[in-house]
Amino acid sequence: MYMCRTYNGFDINSIESYKKNIRSVIDNGTLYDDVFSGVVKDSRGNICPTTIILPTLAMQAKKKIESELKKATAKGIDWAEGAEETKTIEYFMELLDKKIHEAKDSLLERFDWITSQPAASAKFMYENGTMGGYVKDEGIKSALRHGTIVIGQLGLAETLQILIGEDHGKIVRDETTNELLMTKGMDLAKRIEQLFKTRCAEFKNEYKLNFGVYYTPAENLCYTAMKKFKAKYGVIEHVSDHDYFTNSMHVPVWEKMTPFEKIDIESQLTGYSSAGSMTYVELDGSAKNNLQAVEELVNYAMDKDIPYFGINLPNDICNSCGYTDDIPGEVCPKCGTKGNISRLRRVTGYLTGDYKTAFNYGKQRETEDRVKHTCVDA
């Protein structure tokens, strides 16, 4: 189940342009600036993405500051309490800022190469109007300039564990109001996301292209990046003790919480993304018979301004008799056949056959590690 909110239609990095577009459409029926407009949804899409692997930068920062502390200690210089953590965070932010600029440079080069191709390279896309805005005399750049050029990220949760020893999924509530309180992890998470948002807004204004913050689904990268990370840094508790990195800014799939709590946490970060994000909750098969509960969740996500929301339900199919339900084991409860069960799961937004054959080992393990977000205290 998906839901996209019209309220999220404008680009939060260009609110002024959005307002001018509304005024322009009212006055003369045309957009003030369609490149910066989130009003136009059809006939454009994501042109080229680059993903920054955040935990690698965090480890680089941690190792650098640990080395500096060791040298200072050898010289008899004491650091103030908390100085190591503060210095590590600051150096990480420097590395991240540099990497965001490198991503921008690579994306500009890719965009120039992509738009140098003739329309004949994808005739259907341009001459049939699939990509809007195409002007024959101007080439395919006339159409692709309306799409997004995005800087993505992977492993925010693991990055926070490296930097401060906790992620943003910690739930702390006010004892009187029961409201979710700001945690150390969420505070740093917002600082990191703000840097992405600020830089992409600057790049938009400078290059007149739709640079945006992208919460990468990492179908393959979650696994390949973790393999390289482990090879260099080994197994670190709460960081590399799984076979995958957590997608973008998601709460780790193994953390127990209610669906409402997951929405509460992730809704604080979705607004930093102007080029794609998703929040999902995992329910058991009984939710199929409780539409009232499903509707309550959808309404809650809308109230929290989640732009793209999914509810994941297990859907197992016996290939022998066609029985469909949540089948926990390898034996079909209807016909008794063993080992002929296909398991359909949503993985990074896709429903693509049996997840055990359609995705790599890391995504398979991530899917199996997912906890059900029950509506009771975790």
Regions found by a protein language model. Name each.
Residues 1-145, 166, 172-178, 182, ...:
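Conserved catalytic cores of very large enzyme subunits
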Residues 161-162, 363-366:
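Metallocofactor- and cofactor-centric catalytic cores in central/energy metabolism, strongly enriched
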